[in-house]
From Swiss-Prot:
Gene Ontology molecular functions: ATP binding; dephospho-CoA kinase activity
Species assigned in the record: Thermotoga maritima (strain ATCC 43589 / DSM 3109 / JCM 10099 / NBRC 100826 / MSB8)
Catalytic activity: 3'-dephospho-CoA + ATP = ADP + CoA + H(+)
Pathway stated in the Swiss-Prot or TrEMBL entry: Cofactor biosynthesis; coenzyme A biosynthesis; CoA from (R)-pantothenate: step 5/5
Enzyme category, top tier: transferase
Job of this protein: Catalyzes the phosphorylation of the 3'-hydroxyl group of dephosphocoenzyme A to form coenzyme A.
Localization per Swiss-Prot or TrEMBL: Cytoplasm
Protein name: Dephospho-CoA kinase
One BP term from GO: coenzyme A biosynthetic process
Disulfide pattern: none
Domain DPCK, residue spans: 2-180
Length: 180
């Protein structure tokens, strides 16, 4: 079974994935980490698109790249057109060779088409205030995540870790019931 976990920056996607890993033995596929690997593989193309300043000591400086791509939708689109197909292919390869419960953690699950690989999708949501408390840099990125709309099962994460664990437990009961 493949479950996608999505939501905006700072909502608690990683925490939900950690709960699924620890309580249910899920294999978590962190799409951000895959993205970091893919960036290194396409660094020459990144220099072509965004200039040499995106490299530092021969490696992609993700902070500089983020500064460039999050200043315009056009730059973000260029980056996504380059890396998303490669990332999706890598996720599909992992799913093909992994058994048991697989969890895909991705803010841009739908935009990347990864939701099509999932049996279920959990969207983690939190208030803007909660998000900004958790992550000071979130404000800049939130405007580029406006298209992340809740899909599948929605889990609100504005409270405690214990509360979130209970909600994830309830979700998993539903998911297992639907499976039978």
């Amino acid at each position: 079974m493949v479950i996608g976990v999505t939501g905006k920056i700072g909502t608690g996607k990683s925490t939900v994935c950690e709960i699924l890993k620890n309580k249910y033995g899920a294999h978590v596929v962190n799409v951000d980490r895959i993205g970091h690997e893919v960036l290194e593989e396409v660094k020459e193309k990144l220099v072509e698109l965004f200039g040499g300043s995106v490299l530092e000591d021969g490696k992609v400086n993700r902070k500089k790249l983020a500064g460039i791509v999050f200043e315009s939708r056009e730059n973000l689109k260029k980056l996504e057109l380059l890396v998303h197909p490669l990332m999706k292919k890598r996720v599909q390869e992992i799913i093909n060779k992994t058994s048991g419960l697989i969890v895909i953690e991705a803010a841009l699950l739908k935009r990347m088409g990864l939701d099509q690989l999932c049996d279920h999708v959990i969207t983690v949501v939190a208030s803007r205030e909660t998000i900004l408390k958790r992550n000071r840099e979130a404000d800049r990125r939130l405007k580029f995540q406006e298209d992340i709309v809740p899909q599948g099962i929605v889990v609100a994460n504005n409270s405690t870790l214990e509360d979130l664990e209970k909600k994830v437990e309830e979700v998993m009961k539903l998911v297992w019931e639907k499976r039978e």
